[in-house]
Design a protein with these regions (language model features):
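Alpha-helix initiation/capping motif
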Residues: 26-28, 56
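DNA-recognition helix of helix-turn-helix
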Residues: 54-58, 72
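Charged, low-complexity intrinsically disordered regulatory/assembly segments
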Residues: 77-106
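Amphipathic alpha-helical segments used for helix-helix packing
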Residues: 1, 13, 46-54
Length: 106
């Protein structure tokens, strides 16, 4: 029987070493990055296969690049991001200019 999540985990195992090598991240971070990008791609795929996608190929490329860069930047710059062990309020305050420096780890 087909399972989308089992398929995702199978592919994740194959892609993990490449992500770790190219992006210089841990296995946990690679799995986090892959999972989040997989969710974005599958959301867009739903729009495409239902013939309800309002975005051009160029817009889709920009969307995917934006998500990819954002996730990678958060992994690299917010300690504990991939593990979910960070202070979300502090991160948003810092991004909004309320605090100086990087967000502390919980």
């Amino acid at each position: 029987e087909y399972s989308a999540m089992a398929s995702m985990r199978h592919l994740q195992e194959h892609v993990r070493p490449t992500l770790m090598r190219i992006y210089r991240i841990t296995a946990e971070e690679a799995d986090f990055y892959f999972r989040d990008m997989w969710l974005v791609v599958h959301s867009l795929a739903t729009l495409i296969v239902t013939n309800d996608c309002p975005y051009s190929d160029e817009e889709l490329a920009r969307l995917l690049t934006g998500f990819s860069v954002s996730i990678y930047k958060a992994i690299r710059e917010i300690p504990g991001f991939a593990a979910g062990a960070f202070d979300r309020d502090a991160v948003f305050r810092a991004l909004a200019g309320g605090d100086e420096g990087k967000a502390p780890v919980k």
